[in-house]
UniProtKB/Swiss-Prot annotation:
The gene is COF1. GO terms for cellular component: actin cortical patch; actin cytoskeleton; cytoplasm; nuclear matrix. This is Cofilin. It comes from the Eukaryota. Keywords: Actin-binding, Cell cycle, Cell division, Cytoplasm, Cytoskeleton, Nucleus. InterPro entries: ADF-H, ADF-H/Gelsolin-like_dom_sf, ADF/Cofilin.
Length: 139
């Protein structure tokens, strides 16, 4: 089900910057005040996964892109671009519904995502949980 929410051009531009420039480590997306457009809330060059998690509010929904870097045994360092759909249990119902119905618009606009993570609490987006998911999707 589509919500009619649009994706701002800045969302696409920052994603391309993350993909191609490798300077941005993560992007946090939110809805504008009128719930009509997905916008960039913040970008960061911090390589700390804890900094990224601190950007996910415990009572508000967000989308995020994270350039996840990890070691793959003898294969060395790997990177996976992960899409996060953050809809915490303590968020209000209406925003959760709008976020759920708007996710596909953003997800389809961002070409090059390798892994999707859905989180309702911090255990579902912990480093180890995400590492397990991205390393299983690697051949």
């Amino acid at each position: 089900m589509s919500s009619g929410v649009k994706v701002s051009q800045e969302c696409l531009d920052k994603f391309q910057e993350l993909k191609l420039g490798k300077k941005i480590k993560y992007i946090i997306y939110s809805l504008n005040d009128k719930n009509t457009e997905i916008v960039v809330q913040n970008t960061s060059t911090s390589t700390s996964y804890d900094d990224f998690l601190a950007e996910l509010p415990p009572t508000e929904c967000r989308y995020a892109i994270y350039d996840f870097e990890y070691e793959k045994g003898d294969a060395g360092k790997r990177n996976k671009i992960c899409f996060f759909s953050w809809s915490p249990d303590d968020a209000k119902i209406k925003p959760k519904m709008v976020f759920a119905s708007s996710k596909d618009a953003l997800r389809k606009a961002l070409v090059g995502i390798s892994t999707e993570i859905q989180g309702t609490d911090f255990s579902e987006v912990s480093y180890d949980t995400v590492l397990d998911k991205v390393s299983r999707s690697t051949f």
